Amino acid sequence: MFYSEAILSKKGPLAKVWLAAHWEKKLSKVQTLHTSIEQSVHAIVTEETAPMALRLSGQLMLGVVRIYSRKARYLLEDCTEALMRLKMSFQPGQVDMIEPATALQSLKGKDAVTQSANLTLPETITEFDLLVPDSTFDFQWSQLLRTPSRSSNTLELHSLPISSSPSFPSSQLSIEAGRNAQVESGFSLGESFAHVGNDMQFHLPISNSGAATPRSVHSDNQSQISIEVGRDAPAAAATDLSGIIGPQMTKSPASSVTHFSTPSMLPIGGTSLDDELLAPVDDLNLDLGLDDLLGDEQGANAPAIEADEQAETSSIHLPSDIMEDDSSRPAAAGVEEGQVVESATAPQQEKINPQKTVRRQRAIIDPVTELSSKQMKKQLADTSSITSPLCLNTSSIVFNATVNFTRNGKFNTSIFSSNLNPKVNELLQADFKQAILRKRKNESPEEVEPAKHQRTDTSTENQETAEVLDPEEIAAAELANITEAAIATLPQETVVQPEGEAPELGSPMGFPVTALESADDSLFDAPPVMLDEADLLGSERLDSSVSEALPSSQTAKDSLRNKWDPYTEGEKVSFQTLSAGCNREEAVQLFFDVLVLATKDVISVKQDVAIQNEITLTAKRGMLLSSL
């Protein structure tokens, strides 16, 4: 097959299309993406290059479909890759940092805006910036509890919780505190020293005092840990500086030095922070003359200081989260630490304890696992439950009709259309070949040389009659002339059967004798010189007419099956029942079918003289089979 130059060329709208239709694997991704489907389809439809056959255009369309499929697959892969990159870029904690050396090299030649956008600041936050901020002694409640974003929620002083430290929800706390972040709660002095002892590894004799010091900025019942301490670490003990500073720290000072600065509102135990820090100054026994000065300042400024304190603490702004936390907190605030620890470790113990696996039920074993010998013998003796009656006639009526419809001449009507030419339908008949063979057989004696000795008294009338009549017409006429009266008048002769052959069903049983039996045997036994050409032709016609009068075994069986289709061997039916509703010719033909099948041992025939010579037919094994 020759292709045009447009198809076999390396360039053009049809170059890659033809290659994709035959060798798709040889096309690369670039060649596939650069192929224009619109131009290729336009070239195929319009046939600009050369007229193409239907097969060639179909192959080119196949190539177009394959190129389109590969383009769609490439597009899907690109979209999937882009989507995965977007998902990976938005993952929490994923930052794509570029290397410094490669960044400077890649940024050469770009504008200043792109360079400034890609620059990153160095990390200047160190470990020392994450420590607890230094405590100042001039904190006020208004500074600690004021929230700018939620200033509308006001809380009166009498509605504050009784706890020694304010309560904050755990969601507002962070382990790492910012540099300029506001202090979210008050810190006790003992707690601050406890952290110093833990961080600097100072073995200080810190013990619990009677003062209740807060261990955390939370107020819930669970054990919470301060900043820079492990989440699940044991609770730090409350600190008391009485052992370090001296026993004089515990006694309340006569004159407080807190008047040097603004009074602190952070409660630590029963005393204030300033009193505990500056208490040793009173015990130094130094007569500096400051008592009078402090006494005068205290006496003069005492009412003003108390008024300022009342103004600051009368209206305190708290976030709404604190209000909800305080309202939902149980009334019993003084819970022992042992109960808190148990409640905190209870969920962990539940997680550690494995769940009990449900045991599967064991399979129940049958008590009887073997059959007894008596039961086995009983089953062998009685097999009615496992056997069924033998039915050799497995073929149905529809199957038999399908197998034998060619013999009935219905093959053409079921295969070809009804408007077929009659002459063509005649040629397609199943018996057309048989008719040709019979015609050749009848014409063959004319070609044979005549006998040497011929009789001189041959009559021309017999020859003219033989030439005019057709063998088929003769057989049909002889079959039509057979009537009951003709059958009764046929001569009945006793035929001697050789040994080993089946007995012929002749006149002893009352059956009529066929034309073959009534023919004169002298015609066949006479020497050839006694027969002329007309007699020889007449004998052959007689043989053919008799053979046509007697149906074949399969035809007789099929004809009988149309009226009687037994299912089991030994099934019986009477001839009067089969011939009921038949005319005279059909009854004679049915009788001949019965005779033929009886000679082939397909059925057995019996005539009962006691019951008005009734003929009974019994089916044998051959009748149950589909073919003989």
UniProtKB/Swiss-Prot annotation:
Biased composition regions of type Basic and acidic residues, renumbered to the chain: 449-458
Region (Disordered): 439-466
Keywords in alphabetical order: Cell cycle, Cell division, Centromere, Chromosome, Chromosome partition, DNA damage, DNA repair, Mitosis, Nucleus, Phosphoprotein
A GO CC term attached to the entry: condensed chromosome, centromeric region
Superkingdom of the source species: Eukaryota
Subcellular location field: Nucleus; Chromosome, Centromere
Function in brief: Cleavable component of the cohesin complex, involved in chromosome cohesion during cell cycle. The cohesin complex is required for the cohesion of sister chromatids after DNA replication. The cohesin complex apparently forms a large proteinaceous ring within which sister chromatids can be trapped. At metaphase-anaphase transition, this protein is cleaved by cut1 and dissociates from chromatin, allowing sister chromatids to segregate. Also involved in the DNA double-strand-break (DSB) repair system.
GO molecular function: chromatin binding
Similarity comment: Belongs to the rad21 family.
Single Gene Ontology BP annotation: DNA damage response
Site (Cleavage): R179, N180, R231, D232
PTM per Swiss-Prot/TrEMBL: Hyperphosphorylated during S and G2 phases. Proteolytic cleavage of a fraction of hyperphosphorylated form at the onset of anaphase may be essential for the proper progression of anaphase and sister chromatid separation.
InterPro entries: Rad21/Rec8-like, Rad21/Rec8_C_eu, Rad21_Rec8_N, ScpA-like_C, WH_DNA-bd_sf
Protein name as catalogued: Cohesin subunit rad21
Predominant location: nucleus
Subunit structure: Cohesin complexes are composed of the psm1/smc1 and psm3/smc3 heterodimer attached via their hinge domain, rad21/scc1 which link them, and psc3/scc3, which interacts with rad21. Interacts with ssl3.
Modified residues (Phosphoserine): S219, S547, S553
